[in-house]
Amino acid sequence: MKETRSKQPDITPDMLLRAYSIGLFPMADSADDPELFWVEPEIRGIIPLDRFHVSRSLAKVIRRRPFDIRFDTAFSEVIEGCAQRAPDRPTTWINDTIRALYAALHKMGHAHSVEAWEGDTLVGGLYGVSLGAAFFGESMFSRRTDASKICLVHLVQRLRSKGFQLLDTQFTTEHLKSFGAVDVPKVEYEVLLAKAIASPNLDF
């Protein structure tokens, strides 16, 4: 995996969008480290939108509508949820610089959140970046069983309905593979990315 170190003051929202358009995304070593670095994986994770898979058990849960699913009503709160430590996530790479950059992208209409609510309580969500006909998933969190999974299902439904071509997950995990995520070589990913980026920016 290639990394390029860059001091955080150099990165602007416009630079961040440009980076996404050529296959780069930023990370930090920890929440307390102000420095960001660019990541360019040799193997990229994507979820082919036409091969997204929902298990029977999860489909059954979704039919019960356990959560109110909303879009872009609590973007900063979703990032905070993703930044919090959890039993399966003892450390986080989301620092103050990441928060500020993605908040700016949200105001520009390029960063979005999918949220699971129980009444007035946010119990799960995910966020990512839209550019052209591509959506780049960044992070997700869950405070109730299946909350983030259900947000992912609603994200894919939204992307399909709007005509998106690419859902980039950056890396794959066993969790994402259960939904149909696959690893693709960098060269193949670049072709998919170029096609999606060539599209006008789609409404999310």
UniProtKB/Swiss-Prot annotation:
Domain of life of the organism encoding this protein: Bacteria
Reaction catalyzed: N-terminal L-lysyl-[protein] + L-leucyl-tRNA(Leu) = N-terminal L-leucyl-L-lysyl-[protein] + tRNA(Leu) + H(+); N-terminal L-arginyl-[protein] + L-leucyl-tRNA(Leu) = N-terminal L-leucyl-L-arginyl-[protein] + tRNA(Leu) + H(+); L-phenylalanyl-tRNA(Phe) + an N-terminal L-alpha-aminoacyl-[protein] = an N-terminal L-phenylalanyl-L-alpha-aminoacyl-[protein] + tRNA(Phe)
Subcellular location: Cytoplasm
Molecular functions per Gene Ontology: leucyl-tRNA--protein transferase activity
One CC-aspect GO term: cytoplasm
Pfam family, one: Leu_Phe_trans
Broad class of enzyme this protein falls into: transferase
Major place of residence: cytoplasm
UniProt cross-references to SUPFAM superfamilies, sorted A to Z: Acyl-CoA N-acyltransferases (Nat)
EC number, as in UniProt: 2.3.2.6
Gene Ontology process terms (BP): protein catabolic process
InterPro entries: Acyl_CoA_acyltransferase (IPR016181), Leu/Phe-tRNA_Trfase (IPR004616), Leu/Phe-tRNA_Trfase_C (IPR042203)
Entry keyword set: Acyltransferase, Cytoplasm, Transferase
Family designation: Belongs to the L/F-transferase family.
Function: Functions in the N-end rule pathway of protein degradation where it conjugates Leu, Phe and, less efficiently, Met from aminoacyl-tRNAs to the N-termini of proteins containing an N-terminal arginine or lysine.
Protein name listed in UniProt: Leucyl/phenylalanyl-tRNA--protein transferase
Organism annotation: Sinorhizobium medicae (strain WSM419) (Ensifer medicae)
Gene (name only): aat
